[in-house]
Amino acid sequence: MQVLVRDNNVDQALKALKKKMQREGIFREMKLRRHYEKPSERKAREAAEAVRRARKMERKRLEREGF
């Protein structure tokens, strides 16, 4: 991953790098890989995340439709 540093503005480049890493999900992946996760735990976590996403999408859909 590359970020351009313009006019020696390192702070702005770091901010852009953090934003890119956040968008790519690198911080989340680093957090998950700090410790070993058993395959069964991974499946349970992914299933819970899928349920959470489905509920969120349903709430958004109902909010848009006005029910």
UniProtKB/Swiss-Prot annotation:
<feature type="region of interest" description="Disordered">
    <location>
        <begin position="37"/>
        <end position="67"/>
    </location>
</feature>
<dbReference type="InterPro" id="IPR018278">
    <property type="entry name" value="Ribosomal_bS21_CS"/>
</dbReference>
<keyword id="KW-0687">Ribonucleoprotein</keyword>
<dbReference type="Pfam" id="PF01165">
    <property type="entry name" value="Ribosomal_S21"/>
</dbReference>
<dbReference type="InterPro" id="IPR001911">
    <property type="entry name" value="Ribosomal_bS21"/>
</dbReference>
<dbReference type="GO" id="GO:0006412">
    <property type="term" value="P:translation"/>
</dbReference>
<dbReference type="GO" id="GO:1990904">
    <property type="term" value="C:ribonucleoprotein complex"/>
</dbReference>
<comment type="similarity">
    <text>Belongs to the bacterial ribosomal protein bS21 family.</text>
</comment>
<keyword id="KW-0689">Ribosomal protein</keyword>
<protein>
    <recommendedName>
        <fullName>Small ribosomal subunit protein bS21</fullName>
    </recommendedName>
</protein>
<dbReference type="GO" id="GO:0005840">
    <property type="term" value="C:ribosome"/>
</dbReference>
<dbReference type="GO" id="GO:0003735">
    <property type="term" value="F:structural constituent of ribosome"/>
</dbReference>
<dbReference type="InterPro" id="IPR038380">
    <property type="entry name" value="Ribosomal_bS21_sf"/>
</dbReference>
<feature type="compositionally biased region" description="Basic and acidic residues">
    <location>
        <begin position="37"/>
        <end position="52"/>
    </location>
</feature>
